[in-house]
């Protein structure tokens, strides 16, 4: 299945892309996707610890192992900063 990942703010800066599509096997969940994202962009590992994640525009925690399906969209949103 294909999952679209959207990167915002610091995660976009570190990954070097705005969005990316990952191929996962049937039965995959958010924790599997997170592992693939870190494998593709190891520098994101430290950034991910402070991010929130949205699965199809609903906030989720990757460790909750939400089931994914083909065509899902996951947004990686770092905390807001600045003034």
From Swiss-Prot:
Name this protein carries in UniProt: Molybdopterin synthase sulfur carrier subunit
Q: What is its main location?
A: cytoplasm
At the top level, the lineage of the source is Eukaryota
Q: How is it modified after translation?
A: C-terminal thiocarboxylation occurs in 2 steps, it is first acyl-adenylated (-COAMP) via the hesA/moeB/thiF part of MOCS3, then thiocarboxylated (-COSH) via the rhodanese domain of MOCS3.
Give its localization. Answer: Cytoplasm
**Span of the secretion signal?**
none
Q: What does this protein do?
A: Acts as a sulfur carrier required for molybdopterin biosynthesis. Component of the molybdopterin synthase complex that catalyzes the conversion of precursor Z into molybdopterin by mediating the incorporation of 2 sulfur atoms into precursor Z to generate a dithiolene group. In the complex, serves as sulfur donor by being thiocarboxylated (-COSH) at its C-terminus by MOCS3. After interaction with MOCS2B, the sulfur is then transferred to precursor Z to form molybdopterin.
- NCBIfam families membership: moaD, moaD_arch
